[in-house]
Amino acid sequence: MSKTIVAPAPAKIKAIGVGGGGCNAINRMVREGIRGIDFIAMNTDAQALTLAEAPTRVQLGEKLTKGLGAGGDPKMGAKAAEESRQIIEEVIEGADMVFISCGMGGGTGTGGIPIVAQAAKEAGALTIGVVTKPFAFEGGHRSEVAEEGMLNLSSKLDTLIIIPNDRLLGLCDAKTTVDSAFKMADDALFHGVQAISGVVTTPGLINLDFADIKSVMKDSGPAWMSVGQGSGQNRAAEAARAALASPLLDVSISGAKGVLFNITGGTSLTLFECNEAAEAISQAVDPRANIIFGVVYEPKMDNEVRITVIATGFSSQYGKGAPNLEELRHLMKNGETLDVPSFLRRGQYRSPSQLVNTVKGKRDFVPQPSKISRQ
């Protein structure tokens, strides 16, 4: 008698942007066509929300703010999210993993993201926050608001990944425009979410699944996440070095107790190259760390390798400070810093093409005069 084996249902993943910065990040992901994720935009500013490209859009605190935003006040942002708590819970329902992004220091994002995170965690989802810290030139008050917001947020989710905007300066040259610099931050978020979701939704040469992700990120606190890219003869090792030394990220990998990394390359990628990359990463972390990795083929990456590293389990709240030059001497080659991928070091950075998808079946939770409209 034959038996029918039913494959397990794929993990349900949702990505939520809260406030202006968070919604911008979601727009980028929608344009890039990341598959296997439900995208949701949340904002108090009704006009800004009309520009959101996520299929599901939620206006927060319609009665409280009248669609005019939170005025930079996190308390107002929190109250707005609380007013819309029922709708937030509705759009999160059924998710196995939820990414929540925002730019800390403002009103809606800073105040609203803890409410959204708490709702996701209470729903049983693995909840991952990805946030940016403001530039120093934005002023001390905004930085203080951001720090207080992160303290409040950290206890509401499983993992908190922080991208400090000031570290963007390490990826820029004198000709880099402000717009290009912010797109670099979007790149870090985009590739990180893509790599994590790909591990869950795409079978690989060495496969990881949702259980693997959960083992590293469940209740793990602050996390270190980076993407490195390499090309040529030493592409895998170069990608690993670039990921380990990224100036964008706020912590060093050395104190991590859990590490997940994903190697993506073309069909010419060899086992020896994967081993080289794995060794470089393993040597940089605690010998007792729980290390898991996957390998995924992407035909378009013929002569390139991309490595995404996610490190968790740091002892301090936000982890050890980012590595300095002395700590990274072993990552130097011929006097050239490998803290960024080769295409950036050679001045060949270009933002990925803005392939805007036509989003069908949008679902709006933007209150109308007498009802909530869902298209």
Locate the predicted segments by residue.
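Tubulin/FtsZ superfamily GTPase core signature
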Residues: 1-375
